[in-house]
Amino acid sequence: MTEHKSGFISIIGRPNVGKSTFVNRVIGHKIAIMSDKAQTTRNKIQGVMTQEDAQIIFLDTPGIHKPKHKLGDYMMRVATNTLSEIDAIMFMVNVNEDIGRGDEYIMEMLKTIKTPVFLVLNKIDLVHPDELMPRIEKYKKYMDFTEIVPISALEGLNVDHFINVIKSYLPEGPKYYPDDQISDHPEQFVVGELIREKILHLTSEEIPHAIGVNVDRMIKEDEDRVRIEATIYVERDSQKGIVIGKGGKKLKEVGKRARQDIERLLGSKVYLELWVKVQKDWRNKVNFIRQMGYLEDRD
């Protein structure tokens, strides 16, 4: 009988290298928020991938960056604390970009950790095959990686091979989660993240990190219909106007797009009601951050 393997894998890397795209690809559902704006992942969203011979729990950590406020400080602590809890580390980089100071900072941190580290070069669909080996060699000068695997999370290139590589390093272990469970976050948290993703896609650079979403109510009204009421928080009146849009058009489009993803997640029809409120400087208010679901890790 084939042994069953299981383990926890941390995905770490600079903002926007494709960590959330990878999690969503291997889980097969949209769990982690995706956006072209930096610092969009605010929590350790666990994606659970269950196969017949293995269960892999992915921790999609916030991108490494220099904190500018209490929320940013929290995001950094989540990223670094995660490294002590896991069986292996995926260090993901954008193969289409030069090695930056952020990458160097992460590699210096990883050198001090005994956990296996896989270098995952993402976005190989954007570079010519001849350019791949020289870029890999540059990373090998910084540290010894357990494995080096090029992939495209967006296109799915080489992802199945990488999953097999991960499984070869996992210990024998049980299923930690039921077969049909894909995340350890409450559905309300994931719903709020889906709403926030649509706002990030539809608003300008000024808005992204000032946005928080709280799901106030989520009620199953009948067998195939769920009612969701959520509040979108911004820090300034001008941002409120941007999110709502002229004649409420922007907010209506946010609701329409979010509803489609939420219906796919829940497998039910969704009635979604959204409000926009100003909560000045909320990212520096610890209690408010906790209320939004970005809880402090406890020992």
Curated annotation (Swiss-Prot):
Domain (Era-type G): residue spans on this chain: 5-172
Domain KH type-2: start-end pairs: 203-280
Positions of the UniProt region annotated as G4: 122-125
SUPFAM superfamilies noted in UniProt: P-loop containing nucleoside triphosphate hydrolases, Prokaryotic type KH domain (KH-domain type II)
Range of residues in the leader sequence: none
Keywords tagged on the record: Cell membrane, Cytoplasm, GTP-binding, Membrane, Nucleotide-binding, Ribosome biogenesis, RNA-binding, rRNA-binding
Membrane protein topology class: Peripheral membrane protein
Residue ranges, annotated region (G2): 39-43
Region of interest (G3), residue spans: 60-63
Keyword set includes Transferase: no
Region (G5): 151-153
A GO molecular function held by the record: small ribosomal subunit rRNA binding
GO biological process: ribosomal small subunit assembly
Places the protein is found: Cytoplasm; Cell membrane
Record Gene3D superfamilies: 3.30.300.20, P-loop containing nucleotide triphosphate hydrolases
Positions of GTP binding: 13-20, 60-64, 122-125
Positions of region (G1): 13-20
Entry's family note: Belongs to the TRAFAC class TrmE-Era-EngA-EngB-Septin-like GTPase superfamily. Era GTPase family.
Free-text function comment from the UniProt entry: An essential GTPase that binds both GDP and GTP, with rapid nucleotide exchange. Plays a role in 16S rRNA processing and 30S ribosomal subunit biogenesis and possibly also in cell cycle regulation and energy metabolism.
NCBIfam families xref list: era, PRK00089.1, small_GTP
Protein name: GTPase Era
Organism: Staphylococcus saprophyticus subsp. saprophyticus (strain ATCC 15305 / DSM 20229 / NCIMB 8711 / NCTC 7292 / S-41)
Lineage, highest ranks first: Bacteria, Bacillati, Bacillota, Bacilli, Bacillales
